[in-house]
Regions:
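Conserved ATP-binding subdomain of kinase catalytic cores across diverse folds
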Residues: 8-136, 140, 147-157, 169
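C-terminal catalytic region of ATP-dependent kinase domains
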Residues: 24, 61, 146-249
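Catalytic domains of riboflavin
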Residues: 3-4
């Protein structure tokens, strides 16, 4: 009998495991909880964000942020970046439906503003990802380096995928640079997926994203990819609106 991969075991645990509340994160405007997931002998720490704990926003639909967290994970996987921790939607959370995300162990004092030059150089795919998902809140503390592995992770994607241009990020380091060839190839792959190409890897994302995003948001995602393919350059910060999140950390 074929053994399930660690990734599949983790996904199965997050989707079906028993959730025990362990604590609440008090920073941030939305309710966020640390939970312990128990499943088939595993005990896994995870981050639970219930939709009912989301503060109302004038520019995002009510109770939609949890689904956007899942959509960001799906797009990261489709791009092959794999830097959003595994994220699922749980309808049966302790406080109702919400996102459930693999917890990452990291040093909170090591983030974008304290990264080494070599770690900063790793961030071009992040800049592209944020352009595509239209991240309205890329703070410096949302970029993590995992302890023990030095793997780059990204968190907090509830304010993504708006149909209008909302990009607010601390990461403008590469403004004016041409997109590297490998990122262009990745971008073409994503565009094929969004066009429902049967030959594209991860094609099922084209059928799962509509569960979390509005039709106009999906259309805007495809349009942003098209714009970057037509003009493959990292943009400069806009001058006609706010380009940086507040607070930046």
């Amino acid at each position: 009998m074929t053994q399930a991969s660690p990734a599949n075991l983790l996904k199965n645990a997050l989707e079906h495991g028993e959730l025990e509340l362990k604590g609440q994160f008090l920073l941030g405007s939305n309710y966020t909880f640390l939970v312990k997931v128990r499943h088939e002998g595993q005990e896994i720490p995870a981050i639970y964000k219930p939709a009912r704990g989301e503060q109302p926003l004038w520019d995002f639909p009510e109770a939609s942020l949890a689904g956007r967290e899942v959509a960001a994970y799906l797009v990261s996987e489709a791009l092959g970046f794999n830097f959003v921790p595994l994220t699922v939607l749980r309808a049966d959370g302790p406080f109702g439906s919400g996102s459930l995300q693999q917890s990452i162990e990291y040093d909170p004092n090591y983030h974008y503003f304290t990264f080494s030059e070599s770690d900063r150089e790793r961030l071009r795919p992040v800049a592209l990802f944020d352009l595509l998902v239209n991240n309205a809140d890329r703070k410096g503390s949302h970029l993590l380096i995992e302890k023990g592995t030095n793997k780059l992770w990204l968190i907090d994607h509830g304010l993504c995928f708006h149909a209008e241009d909302k990009l607010r990020t601390v990461l403008w380091d590469f403004a004016g640079e041409a997109l590297p060839d490998e990122l262009l190839a990745t971008l073409r792959t994503l565009r094929s997926i969004l066009a429902h190409s049967r030959s594209a890897p991860h094609a099922p994302i084209s059928t799962t994203l509509p569960s979390y995003l509005q039709p106009e948001e999906l259309a805007s995602l495809a349009a942003r990819a098209d714009c970057l393919l037509a003009n493959p350059v990292f943009p400069h910060p806009p001058e006609d609106r706010r380009a940086y999140p507040y607070p930046p950390l």
